[in-house]
Amino acid sequence: LLSSLAACVVAPQPAPAPRPNPQQIAYERLHQVDGRIDNLSRRIDAHVNQGYYPPPQGGALHHRLDVIRQEAHDMAAQHGGGLSGDEQRVLNQELDNAAHAIGE
């Protein structure tokens, strides 16, 4: 009887990994947008240093990125510090256009 009962004992299922809360996801979205802006900024600097375009054009492109970063942080301020998926999508479209202007 004991051996048949012991055979029925099943190890409990491990608890599922906790899902990140929506605010953490929103913060991560903002962090991703900021990281992309930082990468594009470095590309602008590299292109200016390599002579692909003059410093005034590089300055204009940096200004464009600064405006997008400010938009991102303004949007985030409305939601307690993070971005919604739709906001991130809009910002990424703007960054796609900026990347095209930079020459990526």
Spans of features found by a protein language model:
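Bacterial Sec signal peptide processing site at the extreme N-terminus
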Residues: 2-26
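Surface-exposed, polar/charged faces of alpha-helical domains
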Residues: 27-31, 42-93, 97-100, 104
